[in-house]
Design a protein with these regions (language model features):
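Alpha-helical segment proximal to the catalytic Tyr-Lys
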Residues: 153, 199-203, 261
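Substrate-binding pocket helix/loop in short-chain dehydrogenase/reductase
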Residues: 124-125, 132-137, 221, 233
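Short C-terminal tail/terminal secondary-structure segment
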Residues: 21-27, 252-253, 264-277
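Residue(s) in the substrate-gating loop at a strand-loop-helix junction
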Residues: 168
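Active-site helix of classical SDR
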Residues: 148, 186, 194
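The beta1-alpha1 cofactor-binding region of Rossmann-like NAD(H)/NADP(H)-dependent oxidoreductases
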Residues: 66-67, 87-99, 130, 246-247
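Conserved glycine-rich cofactor-binding loop
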Residues: 41-42, 65
Length: 277
């Protein structure tokens, strides 16, 4: 066998969806599976973790702040969900390995990885410093890649697993009125990396997809201030509003579950119609 070439395996390898006797709602269930969500102490990540837990997954959330991560995990446990918090920096490979090892030790092998950790800097291109550029690329791309490789290695060995990478319409369009070249570049790379891994790992029974979100009201993207920002972020959206984390979280459940068993290498756009123009 040529070096680097995936072995031939049955098309059903890693396929956990048994169509016989399974109704549509059953396909969204993650009962018995372990999900790991990065950057989940608040906002989108917290919403993703809650949604995955609500459909039956045992969930691990990561953040760089131990106290905040534990607080979020406690809030989710109070809802009746099985959640643990792990602490680490996704830009440090050793941290990623340690977090993955702890998740597997406490909950079991990771079945679903949701790469949500991300940062953004709003600056014109000529004002971006080398340090500012590196921080955004390091978290949004390097950290995501580290998580994909560390967790993906276990998934490939077990011939099953799902990865959902949180991208953005910023990887498809140029946002206005704010300029954010590093963020835009990082999210475009996330989309293409997702496609690349999907093609390479499909023979091993893995699925890899990306979710390209439009404007969502979070700490990173609060409600717009000023008429120009409001026009670009709200009025230019056919639905005339920003999304909320809880209404985009079900898309992660879809991509993580057997409901999307034939989807891989896709970039699912969820933007209220923003990119139709």
């Amino acid at each position: 066998m040529a070096a680097g070439r995936a072995p031939k395996v049955p098309a059903t390898a890693g396929h956990r969806c048994n169509a016989v006797g399974m109704n549509v709602l059953d396909r969204f269930s993650l009962d018995g599976r372990v999900a790991f969500v990065t950057g989940a102490k608040r906002g989108l990540g917290r919403a993703f973790a809650q949604a995955l837990g609500e459909v039956g997954a045992r969930v691990a959330i990561s953040s760089r702040d131990q106290a905040e991560g534990e607080s979020t995990a406690e809030e989710l446990r109070a809802l009746g969900l099985e959640v643990i918090a792990v602490t680490g920096d996704v830009t440090r490979y050793a941290d990623v390995e340690e977090m993955a090892s702890r998740v597997e030790g406490e909950l079991g092998p990771i079945d679903v990885l949701v790469n949500n950790a991300g940062v953004c800097e709003h600056k014109p291109a000529l004002d971006v410093t080398p340090a500012g550029w590196s921080e955004v690329i390091s978290v949004n791309l390097d950290g995501l890649w580290f998580c994909c490789q560390v967790v993906g290695r276990s998934m490939v060995r077990r011939r099953q697993g799902v990865i959902v990478n949180i991208g953005s319409i910023s990887g498809m369009i140029v946002n206005r009125p704010q300029w954010q070249p590093a963020y835009n570049a990082s999210k475009a790379a996330v989309h293409q990396l997702s496609r690349s891994l999907a093609g390479e790992w499909a023979p091993f029974g893995l699925r890899v997809n990306a979710l390209a979100l439009g404007y969502v009201s979070t700490v990173m993207s609060p409600e717009p201030e000023g008429p120009e920002t409001h026009q670009r972020w709200v009025e230019d959206v056919p639905m005339q509003r920003m999304a909320t984390p809880d209404e985009v979280a079900p898309a992660v459940v879809y991509l993580a579950s057997d409901a999307s068993s034939f989807a891989t290498g896709s970039v699912l756009v969820l933007d209220g119609g923003y990119t139709v123009w």
